[in-house]
């Protein structure tokens, strides 16, 4: 089993458990150059809020889009948008990525901005 398929396997297992709980989930995806985050409805069929380093408003603040500062900016923007829509509590789905570095920076920034998980 290679690294990618192991990550996808971990993500699938966690996603299944969160679906059983019926919780709104904060999903994170990380690529070498960008960070993406979405808040997905409990039924899994609707993206309620999204933010990424591809957005012009976030990119203008940053020098590089693939570091911890960029991840923190995405987390803060996502949390602000979620709170505007009345979403205060989510479950964190790290998509099989290790809770370290950019994933952790995004989560910490979202918590500081007011999201609970």
UniProtKB/Swiss-Prot annotation:
This is one of the proteins that bind and probably mediate the attachment of the 5S RNA into the large ribosomal subunit, where it forms part of the central protuberance. Gene3D superfamilies: 3.30.420.100. Belongs to the universal ribosomal protein uL18 family. Part of the 50S ribosomal subunit; part of the 5S rRNA/L5/L18/L25 subcomplex. Contacts the 5S and 23S rRNAs. GO terms for molecular function: 5S rRNA binding; structural constituent of ribosome. CDD domains: Ribosomal_L18_L5e. The keyword RNA-binding applies. One of its GO terms (biological process) is translation. This is Large ribosomal subunit protein uL18. Keywords: Ribonucleoprotein, Ribosomal protein, RNA-binding, rRNA-binding. The keyword Ribosomal protein applies. One of its GO terms (cellular component) is cytosolic large ribosomal subunit.
């Amino acid at each position: 089993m290679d690294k990618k398929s192991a990550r996808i396997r971990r993500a699938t297992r966690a996603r299944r458990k969160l679906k059983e709980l019926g919780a709104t989930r904060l999903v994170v995806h990380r690529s070498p150059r960008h960070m993406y985050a979405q808040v997905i409805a409990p039924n899994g069929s609707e993206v309620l809020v999204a933010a990424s380093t591809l957005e012009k408003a976030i990119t203008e603040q940053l020098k590089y889009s693939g570091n911890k500062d960029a991840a923190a900016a995405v987390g803060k923007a996502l949390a602000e948008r979620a709170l505007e829509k009345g979403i205060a509590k989510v479950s964190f789905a790290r998509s099989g990525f290790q809770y370290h570095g950019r994933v952790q920076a995004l989560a910490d920034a979202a918590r500081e901005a007011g999201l609970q998980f």
